[in-house]
Every structure is written in structure tokens, then in C-alpha cells.
Amino acid sequence: MTLARFALALLFGVLPEVVGFESVLNDSLHHRHRHSPPPGLLYPHYLPTEQRHRRTRPPPPLPRFPRPPRALPALRPHALQAGHTPEPHPRGCPAGEPWVSVTDFGAPCLRWAEVPPSLERSSPAGWAQLRGQRHNFCRSPDGAGRPWCFYGDARGKVDWGYCDCRHGSVRLRGSKNEFEGTVEVYANGVWGTVCSSHWDDSDASVICHQLQLGGKGIAKQTPFSGLGLIPVYWSNVRCRGDEENILLCEKDIWQGGVCPQKMAAAVMCSFSHGPAFPIIRLVGGSSVHEGRVELYHAGQWGTICDDQWDDADAEVICRQLSLSGIAKAWHQAYFGEGSGPVMLDEVRCTGNELSIEQCPKSSWGEHNCGHKEDAGVSCTPLTDGVIRLAGGKGSHEGRLEVYYSGQWGTVCDDGWTELNTYVVCRQLGFKYGKQASANHFEESAGPIWLDDVSCSGKETRFLQCSRRQWGRHDCSHREDVGIACYPGSEGHRLSLGFPVRLMDGENKKEGRVEVFINGQWGTICDDGWTDKDAAVICRQLGYKGPARARTMAYFGEGKGPIHVDNVKCTGNERSLADCIKQDIGRHNCRHSEDAGVICDYFGKKASGNSNKESLSSVCGLRLLHRRQKRIIGGKNSLRGGWPWQVSLRLKSSHRDGRLLCGATLLSSCWVLTAAHCFKRYGNSTRNYAVRVGDYHTLVPEEFEEEIGVQEIVIHREYRPDSSDYDIALVRLQGPEEQCARFNSHVLPACLPLWRERPQKTASNCYITGWGDTGQAYSRTLQQAAIHLLPKRFCEERYKGRFTGRMLCAGNLHEHKHVDSCQGDSGGPLMCERPGESWVVYGVTSWGYGCGVKDSPGVYTKVSAFVPWIKSVTKL
């Protein structure tokens, strides 16, 4: 087998390349684990001496200025098969290969902006376009020679060297579009492929990331039978998924034989947020985390004009590319000018979107820009040494913080100078700035990382300044450095960080707060949740009115992770991200503590005398029931949707008395309930209180009011050992008709006519209360549709216990088990008179079990007791 492989390779002239490449890989992997050389290409200086000298040529002595390298003859292609001829050395490095930043003998390239001025003064004309560029990609400015770059030699001097831009490149072949195909790797002048053993989505994602075709790859396989004769370089590739190129992944050198199932590795590149979002990439930066923004639309790549471009737009781009960290917008073709069409203009993201497609913007292709206005972004990863300004009104001002060892910390102002400020602002993309008192910004609770910082003003990075060791200082947070950088004419909006949304509210201005982090929507725990936190959420969503916080899963329990706990906003922040003081995902909560907000909240409006009189003269009005259509059947009701619903509670000095029964408000001072509610604790008025206007039993609300009990009247025919005559009236404390104050959330129900038969006159019936939901008793007021049934159903089921003073109601369908358990004992069964008002026809009384098939609920028939009710209440 070995002899056959050797003969076959010799026949096609590929033996030196394939064998040499395996030697490079083996040697590179060996040194990578022992000496950890810089990541990147397989550096030839790790080869044996004779191989290194045979394959490379040492650079010439450093001239007074770098000469543009001469073009070398193209290497003779080794034909593997028809249609598979390796390409000669390219004259430039394509945008799809941004990781090529070393010479062909392994020296890392310098950034073009870091070339000493002494060389720049005498530079060739063809090189002028590269001055000031922040990237270090190999280039051929005159277009005639092999790509080259500057590098620093062992003596600290600047030299130049050629690059092989194809070495280590990848491409996708065998598909009709550029987003999928068989993976091929270029090495030693020959394109080869990868065995599909252990090939998964993490490996595929690295390929897609390397080709700038999206942040998510799907692993595929291709039969070798359709590839022809092509070398196999690797098997068992084991990427984590966050590597910048496939060379940095662990893998095995192919030792020959047959790949499992005779399949080669292939990929399909896509985006994690779905095909509706445009495909984007970053081009021209020094790494995959920055560059000119380009979009793929209508079959071609194009750029974005920088009109209105700011950090909020950059936040969305970074999120769509699945790049975390600090997002920053760049203007005026900072990463070089593009060459395709200008696709978009006037992009105005809030920073809360998941894709640029969701942002306000011009129509595709409409603009008034040239490529000198191409927009760029940087998505700076949170690595040691990253800086930010926090606690201010925008990203241009605040307390200086440095990221180190997984935590943000501050800088002490001992010896702080204007040069230090200049270096910080320049690194953050501003031209200049000034020191500001840290007292103007919220005090940090984190560590103090740096002290005695001294910059010369020439540094490009803050950490290049002299300083003490990390964590060594003699300061307090009163000495934290504060800085205000000048945004200039371009303007900079604060990056809004994590997207937020409101869920399960009655309208778009309220709901459970959910935040999008790490690709998943999750909730916020209500520990310490206040109106100040709510104000920041509403501001981030664009609402300017008053905000109110809601706790205890006021809008229902969410699903998924609880992302954030112990939010501490001052109320002045622009986004939730500025208020998070605790690690993401760290909490001690359940979803029963999910936080919510109400935006543009204008509270309880005072009613004039004329309005009070009009409300007291009518009954059965639901002023809020038409605000939104809801699915009825054991679901949360609308706040204020059942304004006559009240609760009978055990009296407590802490206003947390236990709910005993539901009840129905008949007037300002009289409440209707069930007699059995007083069996356990007696009829002493000192034991009870009535709460009106309530919705969430654990959250104090603006319309609710707790009123003492003045009198309890139980029907004289009621016996504790019987369910007949199960009706009672409660007189509230207060002057006549001035006990409960009427408003949109507190109104009386209507009484039926004496001996009225609701089965013939009523429709659209509901029960309400804080009753059994199937798992526990509800914290929020529930409502469920229910049907009035012929009395024979209950007479057959309950025999002699069912009397003519009772109503039979429920749902007999197997999939609709709604009965009296969904309401509360003593609570109302309400029906609507067609074209008129709402009438209390029943009082929740008794039944056999909860939600049991063929066991309808039994309700006291109010129409049978109208004379008694009127005689007691004088209504």
C-alpha cells in the first residue's frame, strides 16, 4: 500500500508537497504544545534547517526605505487532475483571507500604521495608500509583485518580507453558491481536503467564520467519489468553535487509508437568527472582530454609508455576527474603501434589534454617498486590558474602567495627567478629552485595578503606559479616574447593550421584562427591583413617560434562563447594561420573582364630583374590558376588567392577611359573598377586611384599597352542615355610600330580577377569582368562561343536595374542565344581559372536586334572594 501511494504521488508530481506538508504539520503541532509559538500559519522556521533553507530565501539587508518587492516567477503548478490545477502565488491577499499576517518565514507583520516615520518619509508612491491602516495584512501596493509586509527583526529594526497568502487558506467547492460546499485547504501549492471523521458544527462554524460567511456553520459531508484525485490533509478535526481559522484547531495528520464512509468534510454557512436577516461580514480590519461592514444582497457584496452611523448600529452588527464585547462605530472608510455598491444609508438602530434588517434605514441601494463614507465597526472582545467609560450619560464619558481577570475595575487618579486622558480617548476613538471628577458618575463597587499610570502620549493602547502591577494601589474609590472625551461632529450614542422586550402585558407598554443574552431570551429577578430600574428599561425602549416597577411575576412567569439579578439603576442610565452589577446568569431566584414594568404610566386619576355621582348611579359597567381581546378560559384577566371583584381576607396588621373568599361589590358599602366563608373564623367583624381594586394579591397597586368590616349578615336559614341558603352580606366601614371609592377599577355589579331565570335571559357568563389554576392558587385575578346548565345535570349528579335556590354551571367537555374551583368560594358568577349590563347571577358555593368530568359546580342562585338582599342593604 505504501509503495502504491508513493508511485501514485510520484506519477502526478505531488510527493514533495504532500510529504512536506505533513512534516510541517507534525513539527508545528509538536512545537505548539511545547513552546506555544504564535498562532497563525505553520511557520517554516520550525522546519529542519535543510528544509527551511531549501524553501525560503532570507530577506535582503534593510535599505534606506523598503523597496517594493519584485515579482517572482509563478511556481510550476502540479496538475492533480483536469479542472484541479493549483493557482500560482497571488499578487494580492483577497479579502476572504484576512488572517494572513506573517511572512513566508514566520515573522509576524507590523500594522501599516506602526511603521516608523523615518521610513514613511521615503516610502514608494505605491505604498502611500497603506499609511495609517490599522491592519497588518500582506499587500502588494503596486500590484506587480508578491504580497509583502513590514516586520521587526531580532535587533528591533524594521525589515520587510514576502508572504504566501494562499498558505493555509480555505475555500468551498462543488456548489452553485459561495455559502456551502466541500472544504478545501491550500498548502505547498496544492489544494487538499479534510476527512469527515468527527466533523461537526463547531468545525464548520470555524470555516464559515474564516471565510466571513456568517457566525454559524452546519457540518455536511461529500462523497470522495465526486472529488477526483485530491490529497487528504487532516482527520478528526476538533475545533471549539471560537478559533479564527482552521489551523488553530486540534486535528490529526492524515496517515493514509480510507476515510470512514469515504466522505469528505463539507459545510453550509448561515446565520443563527434565520434566513430573513441579511448576510454581513467585516473586511479590512486587523482581526475578525473589526472591519468595514459589508452586506450580501441581490447576489453581490456592498457597503453601508456612515450617515447617522453610531455605536447603537455597531451593537446590532456585532450581535448579528455573534461577536461579544464592546461595540464601536467607525466612520469615513476607517478600514479602507469598499469596491462594490453602497447598499444602505441612514441606518438608525436603537441597539435593541437582533439584525440590521430590523433597523430604520433607507431602501436598498438608495444613498448619496461614496466609498469614502463606508461604515465600519469593531467588536472588541472582553480580554484583559480592554477599557471603557461607565456611569456617564453616554459612551464618551464616565468612570474609567479596565477589564482584567474576568472583572471590570477602576483606575486610581494618583499622578494622572492630560497625556493619560489623551491616550484613553484616542483608544476609544475620540480625538481628545479632559479629566472629569468621578463624583459626577456612579461609584464603582468593583476592584481598583491600576495606580500610578504615566503615559507619554505616543502610546496606541492604554496598557502600554507605565503603571503598577494589577491590583497594587493605595487608593479608595473616591480617587477613581473620570474622563469626558469629546465626541466631535460625528456624535456618539451610547451602545445599548442587551436587547430587551416586554411580554404578556395588556399592551406594548407593559409586561414582564425579558433580555436577550447569549442567543437566548431570559428574565430578570426582582431582587431590589424599583421604579428607577423600570425607568431605565422604559427609556431603552423609547418611552418617555413615568415608569412603574412590578415584582413577583406580576405579568406571569417566564420561561428559559434567569439572566440578571440585583439590578441597581440610579434612573439616569440609558440602558440596562449600565445597571448590571452581578455576573450574567448568577442569581438565587425562581420565575415566580420575574420583574416587570409599566411604561408611560400616569396612575390613578382623581374623579370629579360629577363623575363620582355618575358612577354611583349605574351598575354592571366594565370600563376596561374592551382594551384587548384575550383568550378566555382560566387565564389572567385584564386589570380592572372585573371592577366588582373583591376579596374577603383575614385581618392583619401587616396588610398581608390571607385570602379567605371572593366577594362581589353591590354598592359603595355592601358586599355579597357566601355564608360558608365564616364557618371557620366566626362572624366577628374584627377578624376580617375587604380588599377592593386588587389584581395581584402580593403587589400593592394604585387602585386597591383595604377596608374594615362593620357588619356581617348571614342568611337566617343557613346551616353549617348544609349547602342551602349559602349567602351572606358584608357592610364595609364608612359613611353611607362613601365606603369604597369608585373608579375605573372599582365599580358595583347589578342584581338580577327576583325569580329571574338566567338560563333564558343571560349569556356570556364568567367566573372570576384567585382560585385553583390546576397547580396552585393564582396570584393574579383569573377569569374563565362557563356555561349555565339545566338543573337536571346537578340533580342527577348531587341528588337531594341540589335545591331550587342553586344554579348548575360548568363545562361538560373533557378538554374543558372549568368549574367553581377556578373562582373563589363566595366569588361571583357574572353574566351579561344582551345589550345591557353585567349581573351577578351566582355566588360560588360548592361541588365535588376540581375540574372533574361530569361534576359541574354549584352556585347560590342570587335571583332567589333579591328581596332579602334589598331588605338588608336598602338598595
Swiss-Prot record:
The Kringle domain extends over: 93-165
* Annotated site residue numbers, Reactive bond homolog: 630-631
Instruction: Return the EC number.
Output: 3.4.21.-
Pro residues compositional bias: what residue ranges?
A: 58-71
Q: What class of enzyme is it?
A: hydrolase
Name the Gene Ontology biological process terms: exocytosis; proteolysis
For this UniProt entry, which residues form the secretion signal? 1-20
What sequence ranges are listed for the domain Peptidase S1? 631-874
Q: Where is the active site?
A: 676 (charge relay system), 726 (charge relay system), 825 (charge relay system)
What GO molecular functions are on record for this protein?
A: serine-type endopeptidase activity
Q: Which cysteines are joined by disulfide bonds?
A: 93-165, 109-149, 138-163, 195-259, 208-269, 239-249, 305-369, 318-379, 349-359, 412-475, 425-485, 455-465, 525-589, 538-599, 569-579, 619-750, 661-677, 765-831, 794-808, 821-850
Q: Do you know which Pfam families this protein is assigned to?
A: Kringle, SRCR, Trypsin
Give the InterPro entries listed for this entry. Kringle, Kringle-like, Kringle_CS, Kringle_sf, Peptidase_S1_PA, Peptidase_S1_PA_chymotrypsin, Peptidase_S1A, SRCR
Keywords for this protein? Disulfide bond, Glycoprotein, Hydrolase, Kringle, Protease, Repeat, Secreted, Serine protease, Signal
The ranges of region (Zymogen activation region) come to 619-630
Is the keyword ATP-binding assigned to this protein?
no
Which of this chain's residues carry glycans?
26, 683
Which segments carry the region annotation Disordered?
51-72
Q: Where in the cell is it found?
A: Secreted
Annotated SRCR domain ranges read 170-271, 280-381, 387-487, 500-601
List GO terms (cellular component aspect).
axon; extracellular region; plasma membrane
The similarity annotation says: Belongs to the peptidase S1 family.
Q: Summarize the protein's role.
A: Plays a role in neuronal plasticity and the proteolytic action may subserve structural reorganizations associated with learning and memory operations.
Name of the protein in question: Neurotrypsin
The species this protein belongs to is Saguinus labiatus
